[in-house]
């Protein structure tokens, strides 16, 4: 049995064509079903639906053989015990620093001000600001980052930005790009050794589908 870990939403939707290229189709819609283990048209493949932040953990410990996870999640996780053979080029966005429209970010940096930053990407943010020689206080939140600067909790946010619409709606502006984000295929290293004959065709089909879309 091959187990593939996925999260609901955009990643699942954009992974569906890749699964189809490998001859795999979910028999139930995760948005409509309460089931967390979904059968597929192949008796030897099942999908498990987990939180996006948990995908690397399920794969790392062998509860899943394969998974699809964003670079943002993998960077925070650290990627221990995971083989990352392929950038799937899906669920693309950017990790950005954003502030209120009236906040002088560049001036604050020049003055050496100690900024307060809200984010759920604490590890990535810490490494980014340290590389710039900036002193910041990081405050971890799990959602609604945009609210932080508006109510005085923080001077800036570090978050994922797709179109920038949410920032504009909350009178925020992006001032710095940290990294491009896309989703990656991750593989349990032990599974790759023990189940290579089963996993390699799936990995190859994903790679061919990604190449065809570029």
UniProtKB/Swiss-Prot annotation:
GO molecular function: ATP binding; ATP phosphoribosyltransferase activity
SUPFAM superfamilies assigned to the protein according to its UniProt record, in alphabetical order: Periplasmic binding protein-like II (SSF53850)
Species whose genome carries this gene: Methylobacillus flagellatus (strain ATCC 51484 / DSM 6875 / VKM B-1610 / KT)
Main location: cytoplasm
InterPro entries recorded: ATP_PRibTrfase_cat (IPR013820), ATP_PRibTrfase_CS (IPR018198), ATP_PRibTrfase_HisG (IPR001348), ATP_PRibTrfase_HisG_short (IPR024893)
Top-rank EC class of the record's enzyme: transferase
Family: Belongs to the ATP phosphoribosyltransferase family. Short subfamily.
Enzyme Commission number(s) from the entry: 2.4.2.17
Classification via Pfam families: HisG
Designated gene of the protein: hisG
Protein name, entry field: ATP phosphoribosyltransferase
Pathway: Amino-acid biosynthesis; L-histidine biosynthesis; L-histidine from 5-phospho-alpha-D-ribose 1-diphosphate: step 1/9
GO biological process: L-histidine biosynthetic process
Catalytic activity as recorded in UniProt: 1-(5-phospho-beta-D-ribosyl)-ATP + diphosphate = 5-phospho-alpha-D-ribose 1-diphosphate + ATP
Subunit structure comment from the entry: Heteromultimer composed of HisG and HisZ subunits.
Keywords in alphabetical order: Amino-acid biosynthesis, ATP-binding, Cytoplasm, Glycosyltransferase, Histidine biosynthesis, Nucleotide-binding, Transferase
Function: Catalyzes the condensation of ATP and 5-phosphoribose 1-diphosphate to form N'-(5'-phosphoribosyl)-ATP (PR-ATP). Has a crucial role in the pathway because the rate of histidine biosynthesis seems to be controlled primarily by regulation of HisG enzymatic activity.
């Amino acid at each position: 049995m091959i187990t593939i870990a996925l999260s609901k939403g955009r990643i699942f939707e954009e992974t569906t064509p890749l699964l189809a290229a490998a001859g795999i189709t979910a028999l139930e819609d995760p948005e409509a079903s309460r089931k967390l283990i979904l059968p597929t048209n192949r008796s030897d493949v099942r999908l498990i639906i987990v939180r996006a932040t948990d995908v690397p953990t399920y794969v790392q410990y062998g509860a899943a053989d394969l998974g699809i996870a964003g670079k943002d999640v993998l960077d925070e996780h650290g990627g221990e015990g995971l083989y990352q053979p392929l950038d799937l080029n899906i669920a693309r966005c950017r990790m950005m620093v954003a502030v209120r429209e009236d906040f002088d970010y560049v001036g604050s940096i020049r003055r050496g001000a100690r900024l307060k930053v809200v984010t759920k990407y604490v590890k990535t943010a810490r490494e980014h600001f340290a590389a710039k020689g900036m002193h910041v206080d990081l405050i971890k939140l799990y959602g609604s980052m945009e609210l932080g600067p508006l109510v005085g909790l923080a001077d800036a946010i570090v978050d994922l930005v797709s179109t920038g619409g949410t920032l504009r709606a909350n009178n925020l502006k992006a001032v710095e790009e940290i990294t491009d984000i896309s989703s990656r295929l991750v593989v349990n290293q032990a599974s790759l050794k023990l189940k290579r004959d089963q996993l390699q065709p799936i990995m190859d089909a994903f790679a061919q589908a990604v190449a065809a879309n570029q």
